[in-house]
Amino acid sequence: MGIGFKGRKTLLRELVKYMVTLCISLVVLALLYIFINTIAMNTGFSHPANYNEREAEKLAPKLETIDKVTADMIPDTMSYAILNKETKQKTAGTIKEKDLQLVKKKIEKKPYVNYKQKGYLVIERNNEYCVLQYSLRADFSSPLLRKYLPNYELTSICILIILLIIVISIITTYFANRLRKHFETLNVITRYIKEQNLQFTPEFTHIKEFDDVIDSLIEMRDALQSSLEALWRLEKNKKEQIGALAHEIKIPITIIKGNAELLSLSMQNEEQAEYTKYILGAGNQIEQYIYQLIHLSKTEDALTIHLEKASVDELTETLVKDISAYKGNKNINISFKKENLMKEAKIDWQLLHRALLNILTNAVDYTPEGGTVSVHAECDSEIFYFFVKDTGNGFSEMGLKKATELFYMDDKSRHSKGHYGMGLTFAKNAVNLHNGELTLGNTIAGGAEVRVKIPLRNE
């Protein structure tokens, strides 16, 4: 398909653009750093690294000839020490003893290593040495800044590193957001396809690699749409054929039942009466089967929902009576729990009644003698909950996936005479027409559980 125009960008081009932008920004930042440092030096805001060394050299002649060196003669940017000429021991000063070891090696002209970028000037006096210690780093000219901040060199480097991190983060975030936007375009398209919402117009990114993926997704969408349309037509034809066949079968079944009923009224021996009873029973089963087929063939196409204000509580009460009658003499316990049922809500009473009754009759049929069917009906402000549990064999793994499909019968775990795989199918279709949700599961004890949630509307 393609977007059909020249000059589309590529990911490589975007990457090169990112690298060039980043490099230019870093170079500009470095030049700005140099410019600001130059301004700071020229305006006297900071002193160069050799400033203290020059000041010490200027001070040396005075300290060499003065009678006594005192602390007030030494600038606050320097430390000093007075050493005895013979013993090399400190007699006064502020230089730490550890640093004096380097000074002694320097006086004795022995090799030493200075790790701390400190300079030392040894001034020889009559009976002593005066040693000045100073920093070989650029520093602030302001005593206040020197007191509360590290030296100017370290402070400016820290600020530079912070600015580098900020610039890199801003540029990287900008380009990352541009790429994220393109990825989001892909996510939107894949989400539409996943939800089978295929009537959408794709938005291209104008980046070759992304647009190639979008082209592939569009081709997949078109193929999926064609497949779904073919499947829909096939399903529609199947339902039409099922409905037509069911109507055709009704006529001979009605004739069979009518003749069987006439036979039952005639003089028959016991064996003939038994056979006639079998014919009528089988005819009733087939008639019920056909009735369900006709309704299922209309569920999604012809069957419409008629919402009217009805009592949810009354619906539940009717279900209690109907399932109790359906149970008959079967030795099972039906536990019905009702909570906060709304007096009125807009529902299709007949449709919902039949759907929920299908679920209940399934539970009764699959529950063995002595078992229990538990029903919980409850409303909150927006949802009608209807949960049914039984103590039968539960759904198999395949049954959990396919039990609501037409004609599916889970023979391995929930086989029951008289079931044709249509009850849960109708229930699910009816729940869907109410914009509700029907889910299947198994209880911890191993029985089946059907959960229905119906959104309620009061208006």
From Swiss-Prot:
- This entry's Enzyme Commission designation comes to 2.7.13.3
Lipid bilayer topology: Multi-pass membrane protein
For this UniProt record, give its keywords in alphabetical order, as a comma-separated list.
ATP-binding, Cell membrane, Kinase, Membrane, Nucleotide-binding, Phosphoprotein, Transferase, Transmembrane, Transmembrane helix, Two-component regulatory system
Q: Where are the transmembrane segments?
A: 19-39, 156-176
What InterPro entries does its record include?
A: Bact_Sensor_His_Kinase (IPR050398), HATPase_C_sf (IPR036890), His_kinase_dom (IPR005467), HisK_dim/P_dom (IPR003661), HisK_dim/P_sf (IPR036097), Sig_transdc_His_kin/Pase_MprB (IPR008358), SpaK_NisK-like_HATPase (IPR044082)
List residues, modification Phosphohistidine. 247
Q: What Gene Ontology cellular component terms go with this record?
A: plasma membrane
Which Gene3D superfamilies does this chain map to? Answer: 1.10.287.130, Histidine kinase-like ATPase, C-terminal domain (3.30.565.10)
Would the keyword Membrane turn up in this protein's UniProt record? yes
One annotated GO molecular function: ATP binding
Where does this protein reside within or beyond the cell? Cell membrane
Task: Give residue spans on the Cytoplasmic membrane side.
Answer: 1-18, 177-459
The stretches that face the Extracellular side, renumbered to this chain, are 40-155
Tell me where in this chain the Histidine kinase domain is found: 244-458
The job of this chain, per UniProt, is described as: Member of the two-component regulatory system SpaK/SpaR involved in the regulation of the biosynthesis of lantibiotic subtilin. SpaK may function as a membrane-associated protein kinase that phosphorylates SpaR in response to environmental signals.
Q: How is this protein named in the record? A: Sensor histidine kinase SpaK
Give the encoding gene's name: spaK
